[in-house]
Amino acid sequence: FRNIPISVTMISNYLEVSTKKQLKHLFYGNYNRETNEGLIIDLINQYENSKIASSLMAFDQFLKISDTYLYNLNDNKINNLMKGISQFNHMLDYCEFDSCVHSISQIYNFCQSILKEKDKYILLTPYLKSIQKKLSNIYIEKNDAIKKIKFIKLLLAHNSLQIAITFTDQLIREELVHYYYFPDSKSFKEELLNKIAKESDFYDLSTDLLFFLNIRNSSKNINSKDYIVNIRNKNNNLSKDVSLLDKENINIFYIKIRNVVNHGGKIDQNIDVNKIILKCLDSVEKFIKEG
C-alpha cells in the first residue's frame, strides 16, 4: 500500500463515509522522469483490501466492525465474510443469543473457506487466522449450552460487559427451565414451552424456579403466579443436582449486577463483575456436565 499516499486514503475514506457510496476506481499516476513516461493504474483492489484488513483487525480486537463501509465486492468469499460479521454485530446489538452463537460458526467457516486459498489473500491471512483461533473453541463444541458459556466468556474477554450480563441471565434461566421441565431434550428450545401450557411464560417460569429451588434468596416481594405454581407442581422432572450451582455468586450477580443494570443503576466499583460472572458460568457448566 505504500504507493497510495496516506492523504489519498484518508480522502477516499472520507468520500465513502460522507456520501455513503462506494468508490469503483482509484486511479494513480506514476511519472518516470528518466523515460518521460507516465503510467496510470487502478489501485481500487489494494484500497479495498486495506479497508477489509482494517475491519478484520477491528473485529479481532473488539468483535465489532463499522457498517460505514459498503462491502459490495467482486469477491464472493470476502463478501460473505463481511456480511456475516455485519449480521453478527446486528444480532449482538439486539441480544439475539442463539443467533449470535450460530453466526460464530458461520464466520469461522467463511474464514476457513478463504484460508484454503491463502496465497490469494496473503495480506488478510494473519487476521483470518487470529479470528479463527479465537472462535475455534466455540466452533468445535457440540453442547449448545456450553457453546453459549464459551461465547459469553469471549464477550467478557472483549469487554462487552453489558451484553455478557444479559446473556448470563438468559443462560441461567434457560438451563433451569430446560432441566426442570424438559430434561429429555438435548437443549433448551422455547417452542417446548407450548407443551406445558399455551399461556406459560419463560420469564415467569424461570423466575419461579430461581426462588423455588433456593438458588436465589427468597424475598417477601416475590410471589409466583398461581398458574406458574400449578405448572411447576405438575412438571417436577428435575434430575440435576442444584447444589452444583454457585448460589452465592448467582445471588450477587442478580442483586448487585443484573438488576442494577436493568434499572439503569451504577454497579458498585468494588464488585468484580467479570469474576462473578465467570464463577456463575463455571458452576452452570458443572451443573450441565456433572449434575
Locate the predicted segments by residue:
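Long, low-complexity, Lys/Arg-enriched
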Residues: N3-G291
